C-alpha cells in the first residue's frame, strides 16, 4: 500500500466537467467498476460527489504501472493523477454527470486494498436488511443512503436556522 505523500486531491470525482479538458487533476475514491479491454483498463472511480471514468493505457503508462492497474478490484481505495480528456461522441455516457469526460491516468497509487464486499455498493439491489445493518459502513456508501443523509442534514439545518432566528 502507498501513501498520498506529495499528492493532494484537486477535484472530487463528480465535479469534473468538460471545461476541465486538458487540465491535470488528482482524484481519490473507491473503485466502483473495473473493465479490462486488453491494453486498456477502464475504472469507474466513486467518491461522495459521484463517479468519473479513469482510463489506464498500457502504451502510455508503461508495463509496471499498467500491471498495478490490472490488480485493482472493487472497493480498493486509490488516488489517480491524470489529464482530463473529452470522450468521443460514441462513448459519451448521458447517464453520468461526468459522462462527457474521462481521466487518462499518468500516476496511480493504491491507498488501501479491500476484500470482496458482501454486497455491491449500488442502488436497486435486493439486499437483506440484516446484512445491510451488519455492514452499515458499506451501506452508507450507496448513493441512495447518501441522498437520505443529505436530506436529513438539510431538514435539520432548516429547523436550526428557523429556531436561531426566533
Residue ranges of predicted features:
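Class II aminoacyl-tRNA synthetase catalytic cores and aaRS-like
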Residues: 1-166
Amino acid at each position: 500500500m502507498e501513501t498520498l505523500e506529495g499528492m493532494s486531491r484537486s477535484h472530487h470525482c463528480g465535479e469534473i466537467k468538460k471545461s476541465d479538458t486538458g487540465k491535470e487533476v488528482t482524484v481519490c475514491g473507491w473503485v466502483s467498476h473495473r473493465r479490462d479491454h486488453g491494453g486498456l483498463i477502464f475504472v469507474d472511480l466513486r467518491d461522495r460527489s459521484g463517479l468519473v471514468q479513469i482510463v489506464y493505457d498500457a502504451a502510455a503508462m508503461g508495463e509496471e504501472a499498467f500491471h498495478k492497474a490490472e490488480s485493482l478490484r472493487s472497493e480498493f481505495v486509490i488516488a489517480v493523477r491524470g489529464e482530463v480528456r473529452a470522450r468521443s461522441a460514441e462513448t459519451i455516457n448521458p447517464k453520468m454527470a461526468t459522462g462527457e469526460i474521462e481521466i487518462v491516468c499518468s500516476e496511480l497509487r493504491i491507498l488501501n486494498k479491500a476484500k470482496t464486499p458482501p454486497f455491491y455498493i449500488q442502488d436497486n439491489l435486493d439486499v437483506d436488511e440484516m446484512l445491510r445493518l451488519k455492514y452499515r459502513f458499506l451501506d452508507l456508501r450507496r448513493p441512495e443512503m447518501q441522498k437520505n443523509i443529505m436530506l436529513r442534514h438539510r431538514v435539520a439545518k432548516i429547523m436550526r436556522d428557523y429556531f436561531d432566528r426566533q
